[in-house]
Amino acid sequence: MQAMLKQTFDPLQKTSYTVLSVTGLSGGPGELPIFRDLALQLPAGVSALLGDEGVGKTSLMRLLSGDLVATSGQLRLASRVAPLSLPQPSAVFWIDLRLPLHDSDTPAHCWAQLRSSLPAWSDATQNELIEALQLAPHLDKRLNMLSTGSRRKVGLVAALASGATVTLLDQPFVSLDQPSIRSLQAFLAQWGQNTERAWLIADYEKPAHLPLVSVLQL
């Protein structure tokens, strides 16, 4: 079954700078592509990718980031055109927020590994998020010792400190405590005013208290 994508834009953001545009995207996690000849645009600011369980939200994010290799497609990022295959993580960043490959790592070790391929990594953002998400007591613990929520916070710090031109966040509010949810909403609302970067949030419903420049519905 192939997925269909519908995109709507905030009419007040008509002149918003297009950070990422994709045409002719085909691919999926199996032999049969769930996306065929897909097109989308991400304006500067925060957008949402909505859909039920199993419709392809994560697969689409993996295709956009190159974590899953597309069978065809073209990506235009900040006016640079390239085939849709393995974009640099510093350009389009996605990570599984559960961090399944980092069980034995501490948060600091995990971030150090990731930042080696992220030249725009922000130490200031990392430190702000450690405080805002209340991660300081857990920095010396291995990830397999952390709760689901704390572990996902480590992934969120990596994604948001990455400095990527386009940051893809797969259900970022799952398993977070309410103070952390409010802190994350505030950070995204602030960063969403950036005129040259884009954030895409995948979830079942529109994120609360966040102005969105566009909504993509699967």
Describe the function of each predicted region.
Residues 123-138:
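Conserved ABC ATPase "signature" region
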Residues 142-151:
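Conserved ABC ATPase signature
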Residues 161-165:
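A short, proline-enriched helix->beta-strand linker immediately N-terminal to the Walker B motif
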Residues 59, 65-116, 207-208:
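ABC ATPase nucleotide-binding domain signature region
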Residues 4-44:
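A short, flexible loop at the N-terminus of ABC-type nucleotide-binding domains that lies
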Residues 50-53:
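The feature captures the beta-strand-to-loop junction immediately N-terminal to the Walker
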